[in-house]
Amino acid sequence: MKMMDANEIISFIQNSKKSTPVKVYVKGDLEGIDFGASAKPFITGNTGVVFGEWAEIQAALEANKGKIEDYVIENDRRNSAIPTLDLKNIKARIEPGAIIRDQVEIGDNAVIMMGASINIGSVIGEGTMIDMNVVLGGRATVGKNCHIGAGSVLAGVIEPPSAKPVVIEDDVVIGANAVVLEGVTVGKGAVVAAGAIVVEDVEPYTVVAGTPAKKIKDIDEKTKGKTEIKQELRQL
């Protein structure tokens, strides 16, 4: 897994072409109307749908208002710097409603549940489950065969670029609604209890709980049984 450098991300955002894409349902005398260089019109007769950049389509609508009877615009972003990740060829289970930005790395057989928000530069290892409504901030890195519980937050670090991101090592289980702050490393095989706020590094194969999170014990057989990772949930 390759972690993106913060300066790479900053440069990517700075130099990206900002986009305000729209989807326009349009009705009228549409023959011959040029909706702009970026536009992709799908028009049959006097009705159709046009996809493209708002600045171009807005100009076309204004220039041809005498020919256009009506239109409805769908728009979900303004001057967006980062597109969402193309999911079609990723070998993972990604459920509807997850928001995953471009420049995110997702390992094979990972699971991304509904409502998860995953920011640019994040890394998700093979077989890791990101549960419902989890937030992975910029450059947050999660190893293999982890479970990040519902509603948890792994804080992101893009600025300042010198700051260290959150690193979750392999085989870690994080309970629901936990928060791991910037710069923290959670060691291999550790367990973070639900609702914990983790402000310092967690040793491998330990259990931490509380606010702020403190070590309560080493991993034992009982804990292993209660935090078992089920590979059946990760099969494609």
From Swiss-Prot:
GO molecular function annotation: tetrahydrodipicolinate N-acetyltransferase activity
Keywords: Acyltransferase, Amino-acid biosynthesis, Diaminopimelate biosynthesis, Lysine biosynthesis, Repeat, Transferase
Alphabetized Gene3D superfamilies for the sequence: Hexapeptide repeat proteins, Malonyl-CoA ACP transacylase, ACP-binding
Catalytic activity: (S)-2,3,4,5-tetrahydrodipicolinate + acetyl-CoA + H2O = L-2-acetamido-6-oxoheptanedioate + CoA
TM spans (from-to): none
Origin: domain of life: Bacteria
Entry EC number(s): 2.3.1.89
Pfam families: DapH_N (PF08503), Hexapep (PF00132), Hexapep_2 (PF14602)
Function field: Catalyzes the transfer of an acetyl group from acetyl-CoA to tetrahydrodipicolinate.
NCBIfam families named in the record: DapD_Ac
Name this protein carries in UniProt: 2,3,4,5-tetrahydropyridine-2,6-dicarboxylate N-acetyltransferase
Native source organism of the sequence: Bacillus licheniformis (strain ATCC 14580 / DSM 13 / JCM 2505 / CCUG 7422 / NBRC 12200 / NCIMB 9375 / NCTC 10341 / NRRL NRS-1264 / Gibson 46)
Gene it is expressed from: dapH
